[in-house]
Swiss-Prot record:
This is Lipoprotein signal peptidase. One of its GO terms (cellular component) is plasma membrane. Keywords: Aspartyl protease, Cell inner membrane, Cell membrane, Hydrolase, Membrane, Protease, Transmembrane, Transmembrane helix. This protein specifically catalyzes the removal of signal peptides from prolipoproteins. One of its GO terms (biological process) is proteolysis. It is a multi-pass membrane protein. GO terms for molecular function: aspartic-type endopeptidase activity. NCBIfam families: lspA. It is found in: Cell inner membrane. The chain crosses the membrane at residues 12-32, 70-90, 102-122, 142-162. The gene is lspA.
């Protein structure tokens, strides 16, 4: 028996496209309007700042000679594949998990595109307090973090199946 597309979590793949459009659009605007290192204050504690990340989160392995580009690309592809299979196996009604998976896939694909096209990930969000600056990040990173937080949150919510048995 085959599942219909709309009955599975794949129904939420449209969110992947939304994340990709917003992420790649923001990166395009930065690349077109900023020189590397340029900073524009937006609000107190928030700047737009063009940075290149050759590594992973917090520039992990950024200075490792180039092999990390392909390593992180492989990890991103693997994660996207696993989460897509999980969405296929999930019911469309499992909204929280499917939305979380879609956010993570969209963010991973946005950063994967950067890695493969440019050789680095474009980062532009600079959050700071006083002289302390958090690592510069982008909207794809935000989507991945929100998705991961939603998965953790889902683990703390009561299970609907457990409620029916009680």
């Amino acid at each position: 028996m085959t599942k219909s597309f709309c009955s599975t979590g794949l129904r939420w793949l449209w969110l992947v496209v939304v994340v990709l459009i917003i992420d790649l659009g923001s990166k395009f605007l930065i690349l077109q309007n900023f020189a590397l290192g340029d900073t524009v204050p937006l609000f107190p504690s928030l700047n737009l700042h063009y940075a290149r990340n050759y590594g992973a989160a917090f520039s992990f392995l950024a200075d490792s000679g180039g092999w990390q580009r392909w390593f992180f690309a492989g990890i991103a592809l693997g994660i996207c594949l696993v989460l897509t299979v999980m969405m296929y196996r999930a019911k469309a009604s499992q909204k929280l998990n499917n939305i979380a998976y879609a956010l993570i896939i969209g963010g991973a694909l946005g950063n994967l595109f950067d890695r493969l096209w440019h050789g680095f990930v474009v980062d532009m969000i600079d959050f700071y307090v006083g002289n302390w600056h958090f690592a510069t990040f982008n909207l794809a990173d935000s989507a991945i973090c929100f998705g991961a937080a939603m998965i953790v949150l889902e683990g703390f919510l009561p299970n609907a199946a457990a409620k029916k048995q009680a």
